[in-house]
């Protein structure tokens, strides 16, 4: 009988990436297969997020539900990971006796050993340390699940914005060696991945060691990734304005694999609030970055993060945010009402903005960005868009679903053979969360760069010419 693993994930794409690595790790080394049903599992893992308010209470509510399963099956192992685990540590075990393992984002690679410790009778195994980049050296080879993949290039953040817990829960910035990243992406490309999304709390702060002891910047890494055979699209998430330097902007000018869509959090359009948030830049500096970006890549679309109702935010501050939204023309946003995170400097500030006022401001902001996004979508009507086909449509499995460069989902009628490839579609209808397309042409009719994967090269016949030069021929 196979051993079953159930993972519940909350939070950002970094957490999604970490959860996939947990599944790979326990699958390869201990033979666990994933199950969607917690009641079927031998191990339950909760990968937590501490960004939003009441994150801890959400964790304990979930653990209360899992406790009933452990009462029925005392051999069930329950683990809590992620940022709440880093923040709370042993306090989780003190409050939820059913928990066996507590681990942080930087120690998930030690899960097999921690599970064995529990099986040997240890009551609580806790490791929420920050062993820098060690976890990437201990994880199994990457496994592709479709034509797109996330690849973590760094961990942590050293910016210490006054509202943010990330430096305390994931540690300071640590970059993976560039060779390791390039190898991982090349392995994914060999498995059919066409688009990679480079992940980190602040990817443009990336400074990774190279094989010869030099330092690879984020701009250089982008160019290296673009040169990998089979990789035709590159995205990255997320960035900080103060390190969005000119060399990164220059990549947009000469690297078509880098998509014409950027998520660049600003949080507020008010200089006074940006200073209180310790963001390290003013609104005009953010606008300067976007102006230079649009000069390098005409038509690039921008999304952002906004915090509404930060302590001391006045109506004038909020008006500055709305003006920035209109000036930039944001296409999308992740926007939230401010909630104090324990241990952050902003948590000590008096929260003097009325909750009803916060809700009203949030509704105004979201409505403004929704209007702008719909306007962009309508401009796409009648145009031909190149999309990467990711799989069947969510609502109609008889149709296909793909994504444009500017991150819009397109549903269309097509053949299953197109999954994992690029197709051109004409946009014929616009909805709030998706577009409707009509198939125009497949990849075999496009003038795409022909990539040779390592297996294809090795499959060719080796032959030396009269000068002794080795050639590989079909």
UniProtKB/Swiss-Prot annotation:
It catalyses: N(6)-dimethylallyladenosine(37) in tRNA + (sulfur carrier)-SH + AH2 + 2 S-adenosyl-L-methionine = 2-methylsulfanyl-N(6)-dimethylallyladenosine(37) in tRNA + (sulfur carrier)-H + 5'-deoxyadenosine + L-methionine + A + S-adenosyl-L-homocysteine + 2 H(+). Its EC number is 2.8.4.3. InterPro entries: Elp3/MiaA/NifB-like_rSAM (IPR006638), Methylthiotransferase (IPR005839), Methylthiotransferase_CS (IPR020612), Methylthiotransferase_N (IPR013848), Methylthiotransferase_N_sf (IPR038135), MiaB_methiolase (IPR006463), rSAM (IPR007197), rSAM_horseshoe (IPR023404). Residues 143-375 form the Radical SAM core domain. It comes from the Bacteria. [4Fe-4S] cluster 1 binds at residues 12, 49, 83. Its main location: cytoplasm. Its cofactor is [4Fe-4S] cluster. Residues 378-441 form the TRAM domain. It is found in: Cytoplasm. GO terms for cellular component: cytosol. GO terms for molecular function: 4 iron, 4 sulfur cluster binding; metal ion binding; N6-isopentenyladenosine methylthiotransferase activity. Residues 3-120 form the MTTase N-terminal domain. Binds 2 [4Fe-4S] clusters. One cluster is coordinated with 3 cysteines and an exchangeable S-adenosyl-L-methionine. Belongs to the methylthiotransferase family. MiaB subfamily. Monomer. This is tRNA-2-methylthio-N(6)-dimethylallyladenosine synthase. It comes from Shewanella baltica (strain OS155 / ATCC BAA-1091). The gene is miaB.
């Amino acid at each position: 009988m196979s051993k079953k693993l159930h993972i519940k994930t909350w939070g950002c794409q970094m957490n999604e990436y970490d959860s996939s690595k947990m599944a790979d790790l326990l699958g390869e080394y201990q033979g666990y297969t994933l199950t969607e049903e917690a009641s079927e599992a031998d191990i339950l893992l909760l990968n937590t997020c501490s960004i939003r308010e009441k994150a801890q209470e959400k964790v304990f509510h979930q653990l209360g539900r899992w406790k009933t399963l452990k009462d029925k099956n005392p051999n069930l192992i329950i683990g809590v990971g992620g940022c709440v685990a880093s923040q709370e540590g042993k306090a989780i075990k003190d409050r939820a006796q059913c928990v066996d393992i507590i681990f942080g984002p930087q120690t998930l690679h030690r899960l097999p050993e921690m599970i064995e410790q529990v099986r040997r009778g240890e009551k609580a195994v806790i490791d929420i340390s920050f062993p820098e980049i060690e976890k990437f050296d201990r994880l199994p080879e990457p496994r592709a699940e479709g034509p797109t993949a996330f690849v973590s290039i760094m961990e942590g953040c050293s910016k210490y914005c006054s509202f943010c817990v990330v430096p305390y829960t994931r540690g300071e910035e640590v970059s993976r060696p560039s060779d390791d990243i390039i190898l991982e992406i090349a392995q994914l490309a060999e498995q059919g991945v066409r688009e990679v999304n480079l992940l980190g709390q602040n990817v443009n702060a990336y400074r990774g060691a190279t094989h010869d002891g030099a330092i690879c910047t984020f701009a250089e890494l982008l160019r290296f990734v673009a040169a990998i055979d089979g990789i035709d699209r590159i995205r990255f998430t997320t960035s900080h304005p103060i390190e969005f330097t000119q060399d990164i902007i220059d990549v947009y000018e000469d690297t078509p694999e880098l998509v014409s869509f950027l998520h660049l959090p600003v949080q507020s359009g008010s200089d006074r609030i940006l200073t209180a948030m310790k963001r390290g830049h003013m609104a005009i500096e953010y606008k300067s970055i976007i102006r230079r970006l649009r000069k390098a890549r005409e038509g690039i679309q921008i999304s952002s993060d906004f915090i509404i109702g930060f302590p001391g935010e006045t109506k004038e501050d909020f008006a500055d945010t709305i003006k920035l939204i209109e000036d930039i023309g944001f296409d999308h946003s992740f926007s939230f009402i401010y909630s104090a995170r324990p241990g952050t400097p902003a948590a000590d500030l008096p929260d003097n903005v009325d909750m009803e006022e916060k809700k009203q401001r949030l509704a105004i902001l979201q409505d403004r960005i929704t209007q702008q996004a719909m306007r962009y979508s309508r401009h796409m009507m009648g145009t031909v868009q190149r999309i990467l086909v990711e799989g069947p449509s969510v609502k109609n499995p008889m149709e296909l679903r793909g994504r444009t460069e500017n991150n819009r989902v397109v549903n269309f009628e097509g053949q299953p053979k197109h999954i994992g490839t690029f197709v051109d579609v004409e946009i014929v209808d616009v909805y709030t969360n998706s577009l409707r397309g009509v198939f125009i042409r497949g990849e075999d009719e496009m003038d795409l760069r022909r990539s040779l994967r390592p297996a294809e090269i090795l499959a060719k016949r080796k032959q030396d010419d009269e000068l002794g030069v080795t050639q590989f021929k079909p």
